[in-house]
Amino acid sequence: MSTAPPSAPTLIIVSGLSGSGKSVALKTFEDQDYYCSDNLPINLLPDFVRSLLANHDGSAPRRLAVGIDVRGQSNLSQLGNWRQLATDAGVEVEVLFFEASDEAVLKRYADTRRRHPLSQLGLSLPEAIARERELTAPLRREADAVIDTSTLNVHQLRRRIITEFALDHATRLSLLFESFAYKRGVPAEADFVFDARVLPNPHWDPDLRALSGREPGVRDYLEAQPDVQHYLAQLTDFLDTWLPKLGDGTRSYVTVAFGCTGGKHRSVFLAERMARHAREMGWEDVATYHREQD
């Protein structure tokens, strides 16, 4: 490990075998607010770091993650030298190497039907894997941590990265509470969908028809309905039970959608009410979106 001060910028170099989970690792770091770049030529590493850190106005990223693979690289053995240059520039550098058994890599390529980066050399898949192990040996020797992903699925790998590298924002889950009108379709991005059409409809009250579910008159009307109170109690219990289980680091965003006929009264009321409840329960990153109104 380098001796840079704790306040120094951080650079994570992600290397390893194709099919071992490097892309998952980079996406995990990106979700934790790292500035990420994939497939960077290794000889450009010092200039890349210097250019990013050249801004002295506070806009330069302090946490970087760079993916390196074997394509077009003839000088992987120089990683140690370029790493030292970055360290001398005041950057805290850590090299991660991801690998997996031949059997695991073969199965992953069979499942995804993607081509191995070295297949362009006319090698069979087993030959390409063996050749890549030889080419990446210098990276493996330089690694601060070697992570074998043979028995890990995507979610397990993401959780391991977050846990082992103590990422600052590991527990932050972004919650979006959205309202919509069923007549325009269910939002494709929704993780949970709740139907508010079973509740009393303020539309049939002439004094409330022109208002939205964000306004006091509609809120008072709905809160006075026993069915609404029962619905809220069950809804709150459900979300309080299951949202924390999604905040274990395997997810970054969750959208909870509420639908009614016009997307104006009941669905808006529920989205606003549950967003308020989420903030009261300690969730920090909470937003609302009213599709038919915003």
Curated annotation (Swiss-Prot):
InterPro entries: P-loop_NTPase (IPR027417), RapZ-like (IPR005337), RapZ-like_N (IPR053930), RapZ_C (IPR053931). ATP binds at residues 16-23. Displays ATPase and GTPase activities. Pfam families: PapZ_C, RapZ-like_N. Transmembrane segments: none annotated. HAMAP family: RapZ_like (MF_00636). This is Nucleotide-binding protein Smal_0950. GTP binds at residues 69-72. Keywords: ATP-binding, GTP-binding, Nucleotide-binding. GO terms for molecular function: ATP binding; GTP binding. SUPFAM superfamilies: P-loop containing nucleoside triphosphate hydrolases. Belongs to the RapZ-like family. It comes from Stenotrophomonas maltophilia (strain R551-3). The lineage of its organism: Bacteria, Pseudomonadati, Pseudomonadota, Gammaproteobacteria, Lysobacterales.
